[in-house]
């Protein structure tokens, strides 16, 4: 991941944690969609007001089966959620900041991305136990960064004719999940 992306992510974290952390409730989360894609992930929702929470999550997939088949992906997400009822229950809308670095290859097809994305999202928290919730969510936004797509995407720009480098802004899904949420407090 480039140094610029790391610095911007640290700034986002510092701004997000500037809010009052006298949380009444904290919840640990894992995204079952990413788990199904064999991408380990963990997150935390911190309630900062009666109907507001901040969320942080990360996922990492370091898998390389061969030179032709691999998935190397690292994603960090920080977000703010406004709950229409009590925090961690029922409907919410939110904003997300995402930092992603991925390198995927499946046979002759592959791509490498590094981007920062900002987006809006919606979700609903279903209570399935005393301290357990199931939260389907979706978010869309814009990504700012660079991509390399093509057969030999690992070859540096200028050294390989089959790699196509693009820079700019593109629409992305910033959050897609079926999250299992365990409320600690």
Where are the language model's segments positioned?
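Short N-terminal segments immediately surrounding and downstream of signal-peptide cleavage
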Residues: 25-39
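Short, surface-exposed coil-to-beta transition loops
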Residues: 38-41, 119
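Outer-membrane beta-barrel "beta-signal"
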Residues: 80-83, 170-185
């Amino acid at each position: 991941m480039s140094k610029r992306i790391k610095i911007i992510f640290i700034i986002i974290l510092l701004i997000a944690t500037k809010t009052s952390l006298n949380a009444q409730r904290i919840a640990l989360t894992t995204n079952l969609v990413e788990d199904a894609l064999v991408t380990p992930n963990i997150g935390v929702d911190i309630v900062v007001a009666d109907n507001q929470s901040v969320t942080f999550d990360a996922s990492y997939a370091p898998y390389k089966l061969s030179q032709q088949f691999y998935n190397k992906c690292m994603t960090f997400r920080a977000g703010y959620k406004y709950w229409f009822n009590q925090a961690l229950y029922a409907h919410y809308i939110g904003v997300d900041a995402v930092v992603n670095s991925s390198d995927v290859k499946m046979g002759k097809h592959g791509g490498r991305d590094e981007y920062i994305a900002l987006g809006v999202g919606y979700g609903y928290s279903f209570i399935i136990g005393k301290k357990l919730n199931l939260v389907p969510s979706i978010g869309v936004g814009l990504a700012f960064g660079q991509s390399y797509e093509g057969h030999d995407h690992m070859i540096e720009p200028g050294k390989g004719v089959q790699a196509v480098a693009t820079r700019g802004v593109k629409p992305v899904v910033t959050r897609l999940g079926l999250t299992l949420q365990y409320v600690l407090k």
